From Swiss-Prot:
PANTHER family in the record: GDP-MANNOSE MANNOSYL HYDROLASE, MUTT_NUDIX FAMILY PROTEIN
Complex and partners: Monomer.
NCBIfam families listed in its UniProt record: PRK15472.1
Record lineage: Bacteria, Pseudomonadati, Pseudomonadota, Gammaproteobacteria, Enterobacterales
Motif residue range(s): Nudix box: 38-59
Activity profile over pH: Optimum pH is about 8.5.
Protein name: Nucleoside triphosphatase NudI
E.C. number(s) listed in UniProt: 3.6.1.9, 3.6.1.12, 3.6.1.-, 3.6.1.23
Cofactor: Mg(2+)
UniProt GO MF annotations: dCTP diphosphatase activity; dTTP diphosphatase activity; dUTP diphosphatase activity; hydrolase activity, acting on acid anhydrides, in phosphorus-containing anhydrides; magnesium ion binding
Domain Nudix hydrolase: 1-141
Name of the coding gene: nudI
Functional note: Catalyzes the hydrolysis of nucleoside triphosphates, with a preference for pyrimidine deoxynucleoside triphosphates (dUTP, dTTP and dCTP).
Length: 141
């Protein structure tokens, strides 16, 4: 089984948290709401990977003013690829508290939508199990 280290920014701006709705045809949690994130590439430092993933998934315009390592978790997940292939992967999630100076987001093809969500409204979203666990640990659910 392949192992991946995943960096995940829990991004907050003015009391709201950034959630992204996964594409229906790919990823570990197709069609569900999640915090963004992605894999660390060979030879890449953790913070470099985090900043790269944010640029790739959320656009160059989103300006982070704070990045603080927060917690980690792990799990075995089944990833679905755009071509329909599936793969079981052992994932180690490194989660960061982040603050953004703006809300300028341009999502890539991995997502179909995004929203800035106040903590009291998080219960109204179909959150994937990993995001739900993270938000509970943070005291937001």
């Amino acid at each position: 089984m392949r192992q991946r280290t995943i960096v995940c920014p829990l991004i907050q701006n003015d009391g709201a948290y950034l959630l992204c709705k996964m594409a229906d045809d790919r990823g570990v949690f197709p069609g569900q709401w999640a915090i963004s994130g992605g894999g660390v590439e060979p030879g890449e430092r953790i913070e470099e990977a985090l900043r790269r993933e944010i640029r790739e998934e959320l656009g160059e315009q989103l300006l982070l003013t704070e990045i603080t390592p927060w917690t980690f978790s792990d799990d075995i997940r089944t990833k679905t690829y755009a071509d329909g292939r599936k793969e079981e992967i052992y994932m180690i999630y490194l989660i960061f508290d982040c603050v953004s100076a703006n809300r300028e987001v341009k999502i890539n093809e991995e997502f179909q939508d995004y929203a800035w969500v106040k903590p009291e409204d998080l219960v109204h979203y179909d959150l994937n199990v990993a995001t739900r666990k993270t938000l509970r640990l943070k005291g937001l659910l």
